[in-house]
UniProtKB/Swiss-Prot annotation:
PANTHER family: 54S RIBOSOMAL PROTEIN BL35M, LARGE RIBOSOMAL SUBUNIT PROTEIN BL35M. It holds the Pfam family Ribosomal_L35p. Belongs to the bacterial ribosomal protein bL35 family. Signal peptide: none annotated. NCBIfam families: rpmI_bact. One of its GO terms (biological process) is translation. Keywords: Ribonucleoprotein, Ribosomal protein. GO terms for molecular function: structural constituent of ribosome. InterPro entries: Ribosomal_bL35, Ribosomal_bL35-like, Ribosomal_bL35_CS, Ribosomal_bL35_sf. GO terms for cellular component: cytosolic large ribosomal subunit. The keyword Amino-acid biosynthesis does not apply. This is Large ribosomal subunit protein bL35.
Length: 65
């Protein structure tokens, strides 16, 4: 059976850590940031861990499962 292709859009959005967590960027940061608080924008800069319910689906998109 051939290898499963990696979904390229998912590969650009998600990173897998050494511990197996999947990290993602926050939304709501690309434009219209003038009305958002500075603290909010700073928090949105950080990475976030993908929830366990979505983890298996993303791993399949990345060709890891």
């Amino acid at each position: 059976m051939p290898k499963m292709k990696t979904n390229r859009s998912a590969a650009k959005r998600f990173r897998i850590t050494k511990n197996g967590k999947i990290m993602r960027n926050h939304a709501y940061r690309s434009h219209k940031t003038g009305k958002k608080r500075r603290n909010t924008l700073r928090e949105l800069r950080k990475k976030d861990v993908v929830s366990s319910t979505d983890k298996y689906r993303i791993l399949r998109l990345l060709g890891k499962k």
